């Protein structure tokens, strides 16, 4: 199954996340198919940038979103509006 989820980058105690499309059997940070955005919780307010066209494409071909990505999608839609 293909999933849209967060992959952790950054350094210790300074997380930075990429929003990636990956096979659900892969590890959290490895082997992703495509990077469609990023999430930086360390900025004030938190920064979310997401390519909604690519996200909708992957959802159209059967990808599932994680709970956190679902919440971040709502924030990204508000920022783009």
Curated annotation (Swiss-Prot):
Pfam family membership, one: Ribosomal_S16
GO molecular function: structural constituent of ribosome
Signal peptide (UniProt feature, chain positions): none
Single Gene Ontology BP annotation: translation
Keyword Ribosomal protein attached: yes
CC annotations in GO: cytoplasm; small ribosomal subunit
Keyword field contains Ribosomal protein: yes
PANTHER family assigned: 30S RIBOSOMAL PROTEIN S16 (PTHR12919), SMALL RIBOSOMAL SUBUNIT PROTEIN BS16M (PTHR12919:SF20)
Family, similarity comment: Belongs to the bacterial ribosomal protein bS16 family.
NCBIfam families documented for this protein: S16
Protein name, per record: Small ribosomal subunit protein bS16
